[in-house]
Amino acid sequence: MEDAIYVAVNQDVRESKKTLLWALKNLQVKKIFLLHVHLPFSLTTSSSRLEQSEIDAIQDSELNTSVNSLYKYRDICINKGVNEKDVDTSMISGHDVGEGIVELIYQNIITNLVMGAAADPHYSRGMSITSRKAEYVSQHAPHSCKIWFICKGKLIKQRERSFYLGNPSDSFSEFSTSAEKPISKGRRRDEEEEPESPKEHPGWILEPEESPKKGRKETIEKSKSNESDEDPRLEDFKCPISMEIMRDPHVAADGFTYEAEEFRKWLRSGGRTSPKTNKPLENHNLVPNHTLRIIIKDWLEKNPNYKR
């Protein structure tokens, strides 16, 4: 079965309906999840001059509006032929949509995401992303997540899935018309999906091909532990603070991944800037990097002789 498709939707159905319809038309949808980040009103009795009961009523009303919107999106999916049991929803409350979407990606180990992209009302193919939330997601989502960025029902950017652990934004691809081509009646599929590729999973990592050793003056016999020591991915597995392989990787506000306890020690010792960039941290929150944890676990199982 193909990986589930996750679609990030707004409270206003008019804004996200075209994004959802694009996913239903262009991707092979067997299981679909509707994601929503609810932004509660920040009201206090002192600033609003309202009673707490009135504030609670307003916030409950807004939450109900978000829930009802998800029901409307679900109905759209069902009307387009998706079985009701194959439509699910996931909602969290937060103060930033981009951060909320990234948190949902990590929580659900999402590998296929469709979301709105441009804030510019004048759509053009190949246009740059102007939405701050889309830019944030493109930079902070794990590389195992393929992302389609949609504007007014059209694909404008696509970030391919990969297992390279550098900057997520490096894996962007420009607009491709092939993803917009209609497909045979009764079928929906992603035209940009590579044929005959192995089914992707966030817990998988591809082994690097052996490079030819023509003319190299290297020792022929190497132990398995030495080979694993030379694996370039090791640098991505290590915590920037302790330089040891991470067991509990978490993403900090600077966008880099750290061993959770090492980062907390950094804060307890008085650190207020990023250990990587030395720039002030916007907050001290940590988001679990489930995908990287799985990749590291698999790598260690394949390299049992690695000296930690």
UniProtKB/Swiss-Prot annotation:
GO biological process, one term: protein ubiquitination
Region (Disordered), start-end ranges: 172-235
InterPro entries, alphabetized: Rossmann-like_a/b/a_fold, U-box_ubiquitin_ligases, Ubox_domain, Znf_RING/FYVE/PHD
Family annotation (SUPFAM superfamilies): RING/U-box (SSF57850)
Gene that specifies this protein: PUB54
Species whose genome carries this gene: Arabidopsis thaliana
Sequence ranges assigned to domain U-box in this UniProt record: 232-306
Top EC group: transferase
Protein name in UniProt: U-box domain-containing protein 54
